Amino acid sequence: MAVGKNKGLSKGGKKGGKKKVVDPFSRKDWYDVKAPNMFQTRQIGKTLVNRTQGQRIASDYLKGRVFEVSLADLQKDIDPERSFRKFRLIAEDVQDRNVLCNFHGMDLTTDKYRSMVKKWQTLIEAIVEAKTVDGYLLRVFCIGFTAKDQQSQRKTCYAQQSQVRKIRARMTDIITNEVSGADLKQLVNKLALDSIAKDIEKSCQRIYPLHDVYIRKVKVLKKPRFDVSKLLELHGDGGGKSVEAVVSSEGAVIDRPEGYEPPVQEAV
């Protein structure tokens, strides 16, 4: 057994010393998330990212982020028919402190989807892949349920398999025509208004009455080559950049974009 004192413990040692606490948020910047001009609400929130340091560029870490927003928040509408639709927006480019997003998909909330599934009715679903005019390949999921006849005394309202096949074929034809005959902006407007589902419900009345017909989900499978000019055109004003007026030393008013930082002077 060694006899002696432990000098590391008596002096406190390196492990016992106080460490300098650095706030992690001091190395981060806030960026405004901008939605396309097809929605009424342009700024949907803010996002954090580490500040540019060396080869680690902040914009590279922002591109590809996906934001999920309710349609009611995007359209500034309290209608309950809009609150259960969720739109997914993906960050494609960064201009100054603005993150410009594009459509990346749509989905229904889980509680809405599960509340529609009930007994004594037939669930009919169609999955369609179609390409828009501007080259976006989409997979569209449509769902509908058979409706009970008010004059019928039966408890159930099941459809025959031949009727189910006809309704599914009608769903496929309508979705294919609507998607292939419009660009992405026009299609998003149709999804927001739910016009495709209403056309399907109206067209299938002769085969079998339906209710709760919705475009349940939309996935973006393939996109065309990225073009900055098309994204800026989709945002209209380039992402809603705000310009602040700065008065120079000579008294002239200078317009500078938001987030402007003066260059570093090498010599005084």
Curated annotation (Swiss-Prot):
Traits of the deletion mutant: Flies exhibit disappearance of the follicular cells of the ovary and abnormalities of the associated germline derivatives, leading to failure of egg production.
Domain of life: Eukaryota
Single Gene Ontology MF annotation: structural constituent of ribosome
Subcellular location: Cytoplasm
Tissue/organ expression: Ubiquitously expressed in stage 8 embryos. During oogenesis, expression is located basally in somatic follicular epithelium and in the oocyte at the later stages.
PROSITE patterns assigned to the protein according to its UniProt record, in alphabetical order: RIBOSOMAL_S3AE
Keyword GTP-binding appears in the UniProt entry: no
Gene Ontology CC annotations of this record: cytosol; cytosolic ribosome; cytosolic small ribosomal subunit
Keywords of this entry: Cytoplasm, Developmental protein, Differentiation, Oogenesis, Ribonucleoprotein, Ribosomal protein
Pfam families to which the protein is assigned, alphabetical: Ribosomal_S3Ae (PF01015)
Residue ranges, annotated region (Disordered): 1-21
An example Gene Ontology biological process: oogenesis
The UniProt record lists the keyword Oxidoreductase: no
Subunit organization: Component of the small ribosomal subunit. Mature ribosomes consist of a small (40S) and a large (60S) subunit. The 40S subunit contains about 33 different proteins and 1 molecule of RNA (18S). The 60S subunit contains about 49 different proteins and 3 molecules of RNA (28S, 5.8S and 5S).
PANTHER family: 40S RIBOSOMAL PROTEIN S3A
Family: Belongs to the eukaryotic ribosomal protein eS1 family.
Function noted in UniProt: Essential for oogenesis; required for late follicle cell development.
Protein name as catalogued: Small ribosomal subunit protein eS1
Lineage: Eukaryota, Metazoa, Ecdysozoa, Arthropoda, Hexapoda
